[in-house]
Amino acid sequence: MKKIITTTLILLAASFLPAQEGTVPADLLIDIRWQDGDTRTIFSHPVTQVYGQREDSKLYQNVGEVTNVGYYSLNQVLENIGSSWKRQKIDNETVQTTVDSLRKVAAGGYVYLYIERFLENRANLQYFFIIIRDKNDKTLYSKYFQYQAPNVTATRSTWWNYIVTEIPIELEYPFYVYVNDKQSQHLSDFKFRIDAVELKDVEVISVDEVME
């Protein structure tokens, strides 16, 4: 029963995310090509690639392998839920139960991962995992992905894969997302820094605020 409830909550939250697992990801996740030190705004959060840029000969190419991450906080999800449910006049008890449950399942929000690889077997998610670390590089959480077959891109030059995963622990800004490939020769392959939402730091949203 607990697993069914958790799955239902994940699906509910997914309906309020900007792009959902299993769909074509948002263009900004597909189109970004990084150099180390670059900062891009993704879902309102400044995201900086600390390391992981392609070798110099391929640095400025628009085709090739891609590794991109994005982050959507639980507060952003709750804001979306509040706006939607206010229009639908959902009762407070339902809102309370949903908000409390989501905070247990995804207290730290949602991390997006989009990859492209030249070889099909290199783009299967079973070979990837992420590590979340705080500003002092202390490990907070890790997630090893299960088998998920990739899709071929429109140009048929690469294979892509994509997942949105919930983070069950609270996070403080800034924090780091490490993306690691089990098939690579590196101890760690990519490191991204996630900073607070631009323009304002959204405070923790109460049930009353969701319903305002």
Give the label of every model feature segment.
Residues 20-173, 180-212:
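Conserved functional micro-motifs across diverse proteins
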